[in-house]
Amino acid sequence: VAMAWPGPMDWEHMEITEADLEALLNRFLEDPLPRTDEELARILIRQRLQEIEERRRAALAGTRPFRPRDRYEVGERLFFPHMGFAVGTVVGIREGHNPEIGPFKVIQVRFEEDGTVREFAAEYPLPHRLNDLDGWRGPDEKELRPEAIWDRWGQRIREQLRARLEASPDFVQVGDHWFPRALLVELHEGHLNLVEAVLDVHNGGPLSPEELLPHLELPADVPLPLRVFSLNAALYRDPRFDEVGPAGQFLWFLRRMEPLEVQETPPRLQGRPYGGDRARLDEALRRIAAEIDDELSDPEEIRPGLGEADEVIWVASYPHLRSGTAPLTRRTGQVFPLGRTHRIRFEFEDPVSGRRWPGWVVRERKYVFGLKEWYEAYQVQPGCLVAFRRSPEPGVLRVTLRGRSRRDWVRVVRAEEGQLVFEMLRRQIPGEFDDQSLIVVDDPAALEELWTRWRNRPVRALAQQLLPSLARLTPQGTVHARTLYQAVNLLIRTPPEPLFEEMMSLPGCLYLGDGYWRWREEEA
């Protein structure tokens, strides 16, 4: 026995309408606090449910829900949630007969849809599932509960709402929060100039919006979250300011006072990202390339959400040692602070000396800056194992060398007659190292002069020039892929994959497998 009835929403195909956005604007007028898109999506779900209930109440005006436990009178109009919300009138009442149940009534109801009369128990003394219905939802409409809707369709609704908010000129986004543009606290040019002056006095920053607000004298009757949001929104629009806080934290810095290496990629790191097909390399070379942690190996942007690691060990490479940087890759990004912005300011800590100093994650160019003095203080060489470890204190990253300093026979490189020459010599190494990667540079200035001549030349030409000298260091005349990568990057910036591909077709070079090549002078 059915009737025309406002049924449940089709949440699977729900579309966000202008009326929805207008309703959210009105909600902000009632409660002027910034909200996340999840909070707004949940508000929207509750609003849609309220609309369904209001339509049902209107359709059922003058009726009451049928529940077996209730008492009814002849002439009362009832609706039945378990029967598609059919409506009928009580036309008769009689005593019920069942000794096992006890006294109860039986009501006769004539349904308005087709005039049929059916009987139902009333004043029923035992528990019954229909007594538990809230009246406006049927027994199969659990999806009309906000949490059930969110669990099943919440992410889809949230994504749709976010897309509509991003396209709407009426809303402003700061971080993961939203607020109507028309309700923002007004900040004029004088306020922004004052922020610039405050940051200038603090060496460019970083300062939080809460630290900046006392200097601006915004209306005190405006809630603090709205003042913070409005200030952040104004600073985002002004190119003088850079938001450099890690995820979940807003910190502002004067862009003109950021280190040059944060604003521009250091020359030693400039190279072409790899965009080829790794299938041309065997499994061993693909594994070695992945383990090298070269930021140019992966052309995709590094984003938050990589997971977290307490510690990451990186095998140092010469371009980063010269630049005072470390690579930002999918692996190292698990320990470095990441956020929604392209530049993130944090602090390095040397647990040996206790010293702290500024560090910068430069996410769009995939490196971390701020290590030059530390590298020089410990005389870190290409191939040394550098450990980055999270500190219990937020925004602090500890950097150390693995192991103790020791003297050993190692590869040493020097410049001679415009070329690099390698030999095995005893040198003091500041910590543990990867034997296949270690190359000690005694005279960085001499290599710098060679770098200016080689930096734009083909990788193939440099590899061919380096191989004979490297091969003479082993009795077998072999060169490992890690060794060659470190050697070539002394003068030419390249990720490992294109270098390995060139090696596979280089005359005089025989690939033995497992990452080893043998140099054969007679075939070169």
List the model feature ranges, each with a label.
Residues P6-E18, E22, E113-R158:
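Intrinsically disordered, low-complexity, charged/polar segments
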Residues R162-N193, P223-E283, P498-A524:
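Charged low-complexity interaction tracts in eukaryotic proteins
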Residues R181-E210, H215-P219, A234-Y236, E448-T478, ...:
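Positively charged, polyanion-binding regions of nucleic-acid-associated proteins
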Residues W5, W11, A23-L78, G135-W150:
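Mixed-charge, Lys/Arg-rich low-complexity intrinsically disordered regions
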Residues V109-E141, R414-T483:
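Glycine- and charge-enriched low-complexity intrinsically disordered segments
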Residues P65-V91, H215, R343, C384-L385:
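Short coil-to-beta transition motif at edge beta-strands of beta-rich domains
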Residues A23-D31, V91-Y124:
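Basic/aromatic-rich interaction segments and small domains that mediate binding to polyanionic partners
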Residues F85-N98, R398-R402:
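Short beta-strand-centered aromatic/proline hotspots
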